[in-house]
């Protein structure tokens, strides 16, 4: 890792021995362990250990769960919030498990579209609800800092399964709950 940073500093014309940079390789290495710890965790385990048999058959919504991730194209952050709604069949999941699921997938190199899909598919596979919907809204620093330099652009993605995909009324109810 140190060789990588020494080469990086040299390539951009920086002095690797400058006081403020001496410990940077170590600090960044520790930061990267945290930012990409999702590779060392199994999202299925997070859900399997946190559900219980439930009697609720109405929509449950976890809204505005904050996240940040790293764009795999430019290695710059994208951040925002995710809302997940589901209609249970037999299993109800603890809300903290939804946040953990989001954290595990977001702590990997990502694109927003895949992040949204992975969360939806894993939730659908493990919890087996009658329907699940995930909406992700994020600001991408790669759009703000370089290229088109659009500071206020928000990207929205959604993935729907089951009743949310088949029934427009169910989908509309979820969207209305997000607005309220």
Swiss-Prot record:
Disulfide-linked positions: none
Keywords, sorted A to Z: GTP-binding, Hydrolase, Metal-binding, Nucleotide-binding, One-carbon metabolism, Zinc
InterPro entries attached to this UniProt entry: GTP-CH-I_C/QueF, GTP-CH-I_N, GTP_CycHdrlase_I, GTP_CycHdrlase_I_CS, GTP_CycHdrlase_I_dom
Metabolic or biological pathway: Cofactor biosynthesis; 7,8-dihydroneopterin triphosphate biosynthesis; 7,8-dihydroneopterin triphosphate from GTP: step 1/1
Binding-site positions, Zn(2+): 71, 74, 142
GO molecular function annotation: GTP binding; GTP cyclohydrolase I activity; zinc ion binding
Residues making up the signal peptide according to the UniProt record: none
The protein's Enzyme Commission number: 3.5.4.16
GO CC annotations on file: cytoplasm
Name of the protein: GTP cyclohydrolase 1
Protein encoded by which gene: folE
């Amino acid at each position: 890792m140190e060789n990588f940073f020494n080469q990086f500093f040299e390539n951009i014309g920086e002095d690797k021995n400058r006081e403020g940079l001496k410990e940077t390789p170590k600090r960044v290495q520790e930061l990267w362990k945290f930012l990409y710890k999702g590779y060392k965790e199994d999202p299925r385990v997070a859900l399997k250990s946190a559900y219980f048999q439930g009697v609720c058959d109405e929509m449950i919504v976890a809204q505005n769960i904050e996240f940040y991730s790293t764009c795999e194209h430019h290695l710059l952050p994208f951040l925002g919030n995710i809302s997940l709604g589901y209609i249970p069949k037999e299993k109800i999941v603890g809300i903290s498990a939804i946040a953990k699921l989001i954290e595990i997938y977001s702590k990997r190199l990502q694109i927003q579209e895949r992040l949204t899909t992975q969360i939806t598919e894993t939730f659908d596979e493990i919890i087996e609800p009658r329907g699940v919907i995930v909406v992700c809204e994020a600001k991408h620093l790669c759009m703000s800092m370089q290229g088109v330099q659009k500071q206020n652009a928000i990207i929205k993605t959604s993935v729907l399964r089951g009743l949310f995909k088949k029934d427009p009324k169910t989908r509309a109810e979820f969207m209305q709950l997000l607005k309220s």
